[in-house]
A protein has these predicted regions:
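N-terminal hydrophobic or amphipathic helices/low-complexity stretches enriched
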Residues: 1-14
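N-terminal capping segment at the start of a domain
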Residues: 11-27, 173-175
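Cofactor-binding active-site loop characterized by glycine-rich and histidine/acidic residues
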Residues: 18-21, 33-162
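Generic beta-sheet signal
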Residues: 60-62, 137-141, 168, 224-234
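Short, active-site-adjacent cap segments at secondary-structure transitions
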Residues: 71, 148-149, 177-178, 236-240
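Short acidic, glycine/serine/threonine-rich loops at helix termini
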Residues: 74-76, 152-154, 180-184, 240-245
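Thiamine diphosphate
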Residues: 108, 112-222
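Glycine/aspartate-rich loop-and-adjacent alpha/beta segment that forms the canonical ThDP
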Residues: 211, 216-268
């Protein structure tokens, strides 16, 4: 596992690298990607997603249910050698495998996603299979809080609890915004923790941008012998004052030269 300071620097560098890519390809979902960056850096570089160095592949599965933010994994996969540097450099070209929405033809991406509300169900199926075949594998599923509007999400949570899927960890990226605006204004989901606890699922709450607290929380959930759900409170567009907490930065937007330089300085 890397030191906390190293994790923080990696998260910042990945945001910076992705920002430059978005400038180049003029598309993407920076708000949602930046909100979950500290989470995925903790998972991968914190050693919670087991990696086979010889095969250059991950033993544990990670499903990004908020498929529009899958690109958060691209620089991580590149650094682990799962995704080639050539493929990273080709992102935005017609022949590139990399897209705004991830798909499982990309090395290291375990599921094609984008239509919301499906990955807890898919991850639960994987987790059941691993338990029945006695495989020492874990499944992580990252969803957006907006997916709590989907009935399929709650059905899958009930299924996971019923089958005691202690090899499944669900992470909810709570950045308080969806395309339409603030979740509390569109359809208030609070108290999320009480609702999920009410299903009998072990629930943790953490600042999704505090790397030290994230490491502690993932360590605690790792020791648990039941289904885990981590509620990570985040800021949409984290790292850029121009994007933070702004619904219009769900998608990529045009920037002035001054805004570009300001964002570069903030991500430096």
């Amino acid at each position: 596992m890397k030191k906390i300071n190293d994790l923080e620097n990696l998260a910042k560098s990945y945001r910076r690298d992705l920002f430059e890519k978005f400038l180049l390809i003029k598309q993407g979902h920076p708000g949602s990607i930046f909100s979950m960056m500290d989470i995925v850096v903790t998972m991968y570089h914190g050693g919670f997603v087991r990696f086979d160095d010889k095969k250059k592949s991950f033993i544990y599965k990670v499903l990004i249910s908020k498929g529009h933010a899958t690109a958060a994994l691209y620089p991580i996969l590149k650094d682990f050698g799962v995704l080639s540097r050539k493929e990273w450099n080709n992102w935005g070209q017609t022949e590139s495998l990399l897209r705004v929405f991830g798909n499982n033809s990309i090395p290291g991406i375990d599921i094609t996603s984008g239509s919301l509300g499906h990955c807890i169900g898919a991850g639960s199926g994987m987790a059941v299979s691993y338990k029945r075949t006695n495989k020492d594998k874990k499944v992580f599923v990252i969803i957006s809080e907006g997916e709590l509007y989907e009935g399929s999400t709650w059905e899958a949570l009930l299924f996971a609890k019923h089958n005691n899927l202690n090899n499944l960890t669900i992470v909810i990226d709570i950045n308080s915004l969806i395309i339409l605006g603030k979740t509390k204004d569109c359809l208030n989901l609070d108290p999320i923790k009480d609702k999920i606890n009410g299903l009998g699922i072990k629930t943790y709450e953490v600042d999704g941008h505090n790397l030290n607290n994230l490491v502690t929380t993932f360590n605690e959930s790792n020791k648990s012998n039941e289904v885990n759900c981590i509620l990570a409170n985040t800021i949409k567009g984290k790292g850029s004052s121009i994007m933070e907490n702004k619904k219009n930065w769900h998608y990529w937007n045009q920037m002035t030269e001054e805004e570009i330089e300001q964002t570069r300085k903030e991500l430096a």
